[in-house]
Every structure is written in structure tokens, then in C-alpha cells.
Regions:
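ASCE RecA-like P-loop NTPase motor cores
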Residues: 3-133
């Protein structure tokens, strides 16, 4: 079981974001490769987006960005399962910082400090895990 092995590595897709509970030191790093926007060919999301746009709203922010914010919060929740859990969440999608909607998405995350410095991240992981395998 992954919970019993601190040196293990679990790789998963978006479907793994729900129902996974690995509290404690076995989970110290969660990597999110891209912002989890809904698929553009999802008919339900497209209908919601079109409806809001047709009624003068911003469908992208109301539907797509809101959905992505919820999923980002869920994804980061894989790391922080208790008040004593510590770790690094690495979001590899630069749009989280560069896009106009990035600040909206960042507000969905738990309290954190932000860095793009690899050494800062590695040092944090060393402190958390006691080493870096």
C-alpha cells in the first residue's frame, strides 16, 4: 500500500483526484501538469458557457475557470489531508501566473508561498522528507 511506503511514487490522471487518501509523509509532492479546464467538447459545459454568454455574462469565467478552480482545489487536497501534512504542489502550467484568470485560480488554492526557483523547491522537499531520494 502506498501509505506504508514513504519512498513510493503514484502517478495518476484527473480521475485519481477524487477518493485518494494518502495522509502523512507518503505524499510530499503533487505535480499538476496543466490547469484542469473542462474539455471543449463537453456538451453540458458548452451549453452552460453559451447560455451565460448569450445572457451577457462571461461564460469562460463563470463555467470554465470556476470548474478549473474547483478541480485545482481538489488536486491540491491530495497533498494536504491533515493539519500536520506538509509538501510541495508543483503546477507546471505557466498560465496560472501569466493569464488574466490566473489570480482567480490561485485564490482557490490553500495558503501557500509561491516560487519558480528549483533550488527553493528542492530545499523544501529536503526539509519535509529529511532527504531527497
Amino acid at each position: 500500500c502506498i501509505r506504508d511506503r514513504e519512498e513510493s511514487c503514484l502517478v495518476g490522471t484527473l480521475g485519481l483526484w477524487q477518493g485518494v487518501d494518502v495522509p502523512g509523509p507518503s505524499c510530499s509532492l503533487v505535480i499538476i501538469d496543466r490547469i484542469p479546464f473542462p474539455r471543449p467538447d463537453d456538451p453540458l459545459m458548452s451549453a452552460r458557457l453559451d447560455f451565460i454568454n448569450e445572457h451577457g455574462g462571461n461564460g469562460f469565467m463563470s463555467v470554465s475557470a470556476s470548474h478549473a478552480a474547483l478541480l485545482l482545489a481538489q488536486g491540491t487536497g491530495r497533498l494536504l489531508r491533515s493539519s500536520t501534512d506538509r509538501g510541495v504542489i508543483a503546477v507546471m502550467d505557466s498560465r496560472l501566473v501569466t493569464a488574466r484568470y490566473g489570480s482567480y485560480l490561485r485564490k482557490s488554492l490553500p495558503p501557500y508561498w509561491e516560487t519558480t526557483n528549483t533550488e527553493v523547491v528542492l530545499n523544501s522537499l529536503r526539509r519535509i522528507t529529511g532527504s531527497l531520494h
